[in-house]
From Swiss-Prot:
<feature type="binding site">
    <location>
        <position position="78"/>
    </location>
    <ligand>
        <name>Mg(2+)</name>
    </ligand>
</feature>
<dbReference type="InterPro" id="IPR020558">
    <property type="entry name" value="DiOHA_6PGluconate_deHydtase_CS"/>
</dbReference>
<keyword id="KW-0408">Iron</keyword>
<feature type="binding site">
    <location>
        <position position="119"/>
    </location>
    <ligand>
        <name>[2Fe-2S] cluster</name>
    </ligand>
</feature>
<feature type="active site" description="Proton acceptor">
    <location>
        <position position="466"/>
    </location>
</feature>
<keyword id="KW-0456">Lyase</keyword>
<dbReference type="GO" id="GO:0009097">
    <property type="term" value="P:isoleucine biosynthetic process"/>
</dbReference>
<feature type="binding site">
    <location>
        <position position="120"/>
    </location>
    <ligand>
        <name>Mg(2+)</name>
    </ligand>
</feature>
<comment type="similarity">
    <text>Belongs to the IlvD/Edd family.</text>
</comment>
<keyword id="KW-0411">Iron-sulfur</keyword>
<keyword id="KW-0001">2Fe-2S</keyword>
<dbReference type="GO" id="GO:0009099">
    <property type="term" value="P:L-valine biosynthetic process"/>
</dbReference>
<comment type="function">
    <text>Functions in the biosynthesis of branched-chain amino acids. Catalyzes the dehydration of (2R,3R)-2,3-dihydroxy-3-methylpentanoate (2,3-dihydroxy-3-methylvalerate) into 2-oxo-3-methylpentanoate (2-oxo-3-methylvalerate) and of (2R)-2,3-dihydroxy-3-methylbutanoate (2,3-dihydroxyisovalerate) into 2-oxo-3-methylbutanoate (2-oxoisovalerate), the penultimate precursor to L-isoleucine and L-valine, respectively.</text>
</comment>
<feature type="modified residue" description="N6-carboxylysine">
    <location>
        <position position="121"/>
    </location>
</feature>
<feature type="binding site" description="via carbamate group">
    <location>
        <position position="121"/>
    </location>
    <ligand>
        <name>Mg(2+)</name>
    </ligand>
</feature>
<feature type="binding site">
    <location>
        <position position="191"/>
    </location>
    <ligand>
        <name>[2Fe-2S] cluster</name>
    </ligand>
</feature>
<protein>
    <recommendedName>
        <fullName>Dihydroxy-acid dehydratase</fullName>
        <ecNumber>4.2.1.9</ecNumber>
    </recommendedName>
</protein>
Length: 550
C-alpha cells in the first residue's frame, strides 16, 4: 500500500506518533488509508450539508476495513460571486482545488480517496487533483436543491436573476421580487435546474466515477446519506482490487459523458471541465472537436431548466442517469465503472423510465443535441452555445454589434435601455487571461431574458455563461480578445452573422480589414498586477483548451 511509506518500519516511528496524536491506533494503521475530501462551507448552500455526508462516508470506510482521514478544500458559490469582482475567482479556484487534493493526498500517503463536492468548479477540481495521483477514488456529489414555490408555481435561483430584469421593465414589483427571494432557495443543495453543478454531477456519474443515481439524489434526501455510506465501503474494495481511475477513464468513457451532456443539454461550462479533466490523463485527450463530432450522434432528449420546464427532481424521479443511459444505449460505449458493473449493465438494469421527462431518441425535445460548437472568422478555434435553451427563431441571426469591454459596461447598457431588438451584444476582455478568470455572464443574460429580449437579441463573449443562462448566448470565443483574437477587432455596427444550424459565426468584414484593425490595437495590459489572479492570467490556456494552467 502507498500508506506503507508513511506508517511501516522502525524509521516511521515519528510518523506514527503524529498519527496517534490525532487519535489513530496501531490497528488503524494496519488498514488502507482513505482520504475523505470534503468541501463543507457555511457560505455555499450546495455545501452546507456535507459534514453529514462525510460522516456517512467515514462510517462506510470503517465498516469495510479502511481508515478514513477527512480534510477540506475551498468551495466558491458562483451565485454569490456573480455580477462583481468575486466571479473572477470562480473558474481559477478549480486549479487551487486540484492542487490541494494532489498535495494533501500525496503528502500523507493515502491509498484511495472519496471526493465530496457539489458545486460548479469543485467537482472538476477535485477530480483533476485525484487523477494526478492515479489512485482509486469515488465521487459522491452533494445533490441538487429542491425547487421553491411562489404563487403556486415552482421557482429557483434563476427566477430571481431574471426577476431583476422583469422588475427593471415593470413586469413585477419590488415586493414581488422580494417574495421570490424568500422562497427560491429552500435549503441545501446545488441550484435546482440542469446548471453547471448538476451537469457536472451527471457527467461524473456517466464517466463511471459515482455510484448509480448519485447525481440526482437530492441533498435533503436520506438516500444521499445511504449512498455516501455505500461509497465509503466501496472505495475500500477498489483499493484492495487496485482499480485505478485510468482503468475507468478511457476515451470511450469520456465519449459517454459527452453524449449524456449533449442529450440532456448540460451547461456550456462542461466544454471547459471535461477537456480539463481529460488533460490530466493526456494532453488534448478530449477537445471541442469531440463535442462537435458527437453532437451528430444524439438529439436533445430532456426539457430541464433552464432549457425547459422540468427540474432536477423530475429527472431523478424519471430514472436519473441510469435511465438516460438506457435511452441512449444504442449510442453508449460499454465501459467500466466504480460500481463494478459496466455502463451498459447499469443501463440494462433500469426498471422504470418516465418518457415524458426523458424522451425516447425517436421522439426528442429537439432533433439537434443540446450543445453546439460554432466556428468561423470570429472564433477560429471555436465557441459554444446551449442551443437547447435557444428559441428556434434565433438559430440564425444577423445583427449589428454593440461592443463592451467588460461585463459591467454591458450590464449598465442593458439595464439603461441601450439595447434594441436585433442587436448582438459583444462582451470582450473577459476571457481566461483577459478577465482574468473568465467571468460568467448570468447577470446580463438574465436581464435580457427578464426584459423579454431573448428572442431578438444575441450575446457573444470570450467569457462564459452560467449553466442557468438561456437564450442565444454564445461564449468561450477563442482566441480571446486579450490574446489578439478577432473579437478584439469588432466595432460598433459591424454585422455579426450567427448560424447555429450551420455551426458558423462570422463578422461581416474582409480579412484585410480585420488584420488592419488588430495591428492597430495596443498590447493587452493585464488588469490585475498582483496575487493569484495575476499569476493565473499569465499561465492559463485558452478556453478551447479547457482554461487549464500551462
Amino acid at each position: 500500500m502507498i500508506s506503507d511509506n508513511v506508517k511501516k518500519g522502525v524509521i516511521r516511528s515519528p510518523n506514527r506518533a503524529l498519527l496517534k496524536a490525532c487519535g489513530y491506533s496501531d490497528e488503524d494503521m494496519e488498514k488502507p488509508f482513505i482520504g475523505v475530501v470534503n468541501s463543507f462551507t457555511e457560505v455555499v448552500p450546495g455545501h452546507i450539508h456535507l459534514k453529514t455526508l462525510s460522516e456517512a462516508v467515514k462510517h462506510g470506510v470503517y465498516a469495510n476495513g479502511g481508515t478514513p482521514f477527512e480534510f477540506n478544500t475551498i468551495g466558491i458559490c458562483d451565485g454569490i460571486a456573480m455580477g462583481h469582482e468575486g466571479m473572477k475567482y470562480s473558474l481559477p479556484s478549480r486549479e487551487i482545488i486540484a492542487d490541494a487534493v494532489e498535495s494533501m493526498a500525496r503528502a500523507h500517503g493515502f491509498d484511495g480517496l472519496v471526493l465530496i463536492p457539489t458545486c460548479d468548479k469543485i467537482v472538476p477540481g477535485m477530480i483533476m487533483g485525484a487523477l494526478r495521483l492515479n489512485i482509486p477514488f469515488i465521487v459522491v456529489t452533494g445533490g441538487p436543491m429542491l425547487p421553491g414555490e411562489f404563487q403556486g408555481k415552482k421557482c429557483e435561483l434563476i427566477s430571481l436573476f431574471e426577476g431583476v430584469g422583469e422588475y427593471q421593465v415593470g413586469k413585477i414589483t419590488e415586493e414581488e421580487l422580494k417574495s421570490i427571494e424568500e422562497c427560491a432557495c429552500p435549503g441545501a443543495g446545488s441550484c435546482a435546474g440542469l446548471y453547471t453543478a448538476n451537469s457536472m454531477a451527471c457527467l461524473t456519474e456517466a464517466l463511471g466515477l459515482s455510484l448509480p443515481m448519485c447525481a440526482t439524489i437530492h441533498a435533503v434526501d436520506a438516500q444521499k446519506v445511504r449512498i455516501a455510506k455505500k461509497t465509503g465501503s466501496k472505495i475500500v474494495d477498489l483499493v484492495k482490487e487496485d482499480v485505478k481511475p485510468t482503468d475507468i477513464l478511457t476515451k470511450e468513457a469520456f465519449e459517454n459523458a459527452i453524449l449524456v451532456d449533449l442529450a440532456l443539454g448540460g451547461s456550456t461550462n462542461t466544454t471547459l471541465h471535461i477537456p480539463a479533466i481529460a488533460n490530466e490523463i493526456e494532453n488534448k485527450f478530449i477537445t471541442l472537436d469531440d463535442f462537435d463530432r458527437l453532437s451528430n450522434e444524439v438529439p436533445h432528449i430532456a426539457s430541464i431548466k433552464p432549457g425547459g420546464e422540468h427540474y432536477m427532481i423530475d429527472l431523478h424521479n424519471a430514472g436519473g442517469i441510469p435511465a438516460v443511459l438506457n435511452v441512449l444505449k444504442g449510442k453508449i460505449r460499454d465501459t467500466k465503472t466504480v460500481d463494478g458493473r459496466s455502463t451498459l449493465e447499469i443501463a440494462e438494469s433500469v426498471k422504470y423510465i418516465n418518457y415524458d421527462v426523458i424522451r425516447k431518441v425517436e421522439a426528442p425535445v429537439h432533433e439537434t443535441a443540446g450543445l453546439r460548437v460554432l466556428k468561423g472568422n470570429l472564433a477560429p478555434n471555436g465557441c459554444v452555445v446551449k442551443i437547447g435553451a435557444v428559441n428556434p427563431k434565433m438559430y440564425k441571426h444577423d445583427g449589428p454589434a454593440k461592443v463592451y469591454n467588460s461585463e459591467d459596461e454591458a450590464i449598465s447598457a442593458i439595464l439603461g435601455g441601450k439595447i434594441v431588438e436585433g442587436d448582438v451584444i459583444v462582451i470582450r476582455y473577459e476571457g481566461p487571461s483577459g478577465g482574468p478568470g473568465m467571468r460568467e455572464m448570468l447577470s446580463p443574460t438574465s436581464a435580457i431574458c427578464g426584459m423579454g429580449l431573448d428572442d431578438s437579441v444575441a450575446l457573444i463573449t470570450d467569457g462564459r455563461f452560467s449553466g442557468g443562462s438561456r437564450g442565444p448566448c454564445i461564449g468561450h470565443v477563442s482566441p480571446e480578445a486579450a490574446a489578439g483574437g478577432v473579437i478584439a477587432a469588432i466595432e460598433n455596427g459591424d454585422i455579426i452573422k450567427i448560424d447555429m444550424i450551420g455551426k458558423e459565426i462570422n463578422v461581416d468584414l474582409d480579412e484585410s480589414v480585420i488584420k488592419e484593425r488588430l495591428s492597430k490595437l495596443d498590447e493587452f495590459e493585464p488588469k490585475i498586477k498582483k496575487g493569484y489572479l495575476s499569476r493565473y492570467s499569465r499561465l492559463v490556456s485558452s478556453a478551447d483548451e479547457g482554461a487549464v494552467l500551462k
